[in-house]
């Protein structure tokens, strides 16, 4: 990965178009990321088994980008997957899909994000938590065997009834005791679930290798009300060296939103001068 010009490597989550090499809009978006010094990208891919990951990485390399994570949300939506579903058939199919993801990513230094794939709100939240834990136990064993990192995103209660807070997610990772299992803090979700996001980050700093950043309104950083400077100070104080990853909804369009967000982020993410 190209050295970052920022305090932390800067990445973004996007959807991979089927015609990514010939999609002019997508190529222009990647050029803009290159201009601003992004070094990593997480990709939502509807059917990961149908793509050529080597070709995707070669394509991204032309824009100084490395594929760091497979974001499984689009796949889960496309195929109706849920790791906490009360339907054992759906859960089994979802676990099998995760095993397939792991097999495809083995040896590529690409992790898997489990967010939407956790499953949505449920009438029986206690059962959903138990079922999700059982699903993750099976996935974690396969992940360790194949040496592929799996990251569970702490998402708010309105999107899922499992792994909502950073603490809850970290506790489950502790219980499963697997070096290839991590948590994924996200500033949007923390703004809803945490009493103090910075305390949550400090307390569980040994459990995450990536941080998602989006504003309180789910737009890109700088387009809402969150002050990201204390967040980045907290990460710097703990010697965090992983990526910070923009994941959010568009307010206007990609170009306008990236320009606006980077006008803010280039200030709060700038490297401190050597002393």
Task: Identify the meaning behind each predicted range.
Residues 52-53, 79, 124-125, 162, ...:
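Short Asp/Glu-rich motifs
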Residues 76-80, 111-118, 211-212:
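Short, basic/glycine-rich phosphate-binding loops at helix/coil junctions
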Residues 16-18, 45-47, 73-74, 118-120, ...:
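Active-site-proximal loop/turn and secondary-structure-junction residues that shape catalytic pockets
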Residues 28-32, 54-58, 62, 93-107, ...:
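Alpha-helical scaffolding segments of alpha/beta enzyme cores, especially the outer helices
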Residues 1-100, 106, 178, 262-275:
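N-terminal pre-domain/capping segments
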Residues 7-11, 40-42, 64-69, 109-113, ...:
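Structural preference for beta-strand elements that scaffold enzyme active sites
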Residues 1-34, 163, 167-185, 189-275:
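Histidine-acidic metal/acid-base catalytic patches
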Residues 24, 84-182:
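Active-site acidic/histidine proton-transfer and metal-coordination neighborhood
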